[in-house]
């Protein structure tokens, strides 16, 4: 990969550390006891307000939050239930392909881990007692925009979190550069379709388009029945109340 050529198609904005106080004191929270990764929607903290200001400025195709920690390598997209205000049909395919691209890069030449988990792909399990024979058994959902990678999805950005494996500095050193490189390659190869889908999202908003028929299949229940929670998640306003 010629990095200089790659950067003619992709530019990267890096925030090396969002929670400086937590970094200094080795805590998840800030010095005041707040968790920045639960405040992206409300933005009561300057750290979150400043990070989301960058999103508003650049309208990125992808927003990546890199942190930890879990037992293995985990790359989103998330399981259901999805945030009701997402136009999920426009980003679902991109989400899955992006996660695969990042995951393949993250484990390349990695001496500690040769596989990765993707909640949207891996957390739907067989269950002979369920009405469909399957079930979402482990919650790793994007129901709230409080998380750093979920808030930008409201504007059509493919927001994903990478969970770095616990106690594995070597894996982190391999995951981040290789994962970012294959992520950039994915954006380069899919930039037109990603821009088109973001434009479709804006068009739906400007024209007040009811896209429930397109979005509904993605609002499944625990047993992965397509559209089972669509009316609950995205009720059509009837003018009452």
Per-range role (PLM):
Residues 1-32:
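Short helix-loop-beta-strand segments that form the rim/entrance of peptidase-like active sites
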Residues 13, 29-241:
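Metallocarboxypeptidase
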């Amino acid at each position: 990969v010629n990095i200089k050529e790659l950067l003619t198609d992709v530019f990267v904005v890096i925030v090396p550390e969002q929670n400086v106080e937590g970094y200094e004191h080795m805590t998840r929270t800030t010095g005041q006891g707040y968790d920045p990764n639960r405040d992206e929607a409300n933005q009561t903290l300057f750290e979150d307000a400043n990070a989301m200001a960058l999103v508003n400025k650049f309208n990125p195709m992808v927003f990546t939050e890199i942190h930890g920690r879990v037992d293995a390598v985990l790359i989103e997209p998330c399981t259901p239930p999805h945030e009701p205000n997402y136009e999920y049909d426009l980003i679902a395919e991109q989400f899955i392909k992006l996660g695969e691209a990042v995951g393949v890069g993250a484990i390349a030449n990695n001496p500690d881990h040769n596989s990765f988990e993707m909640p949207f792909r891996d957390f739907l399990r067989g269950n002979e007692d369920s009405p469909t024979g399957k079930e979402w058994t482990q919650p790793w959902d994007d129901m709230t925009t409080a998380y750093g990678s979920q808030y930008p999805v409201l504007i059509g950005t493919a927001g994903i979190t990478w969970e770095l494996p616990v106690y594995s500095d070597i894996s982190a050193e391999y995951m981040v550069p290789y994962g970012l490189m294959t992520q950039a390659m994915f954006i380069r190869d899919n930039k037109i379709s990603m821009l088109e889908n973001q434009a479709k999202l804006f068009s739906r908003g400007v024209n007040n388009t009811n896209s429930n028929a397109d979005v509904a299949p993605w609002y499944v229940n625990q047993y992965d029945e397509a559209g089972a929670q669509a009316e609950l998640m995205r009720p059509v306003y009837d003018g009452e109340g």
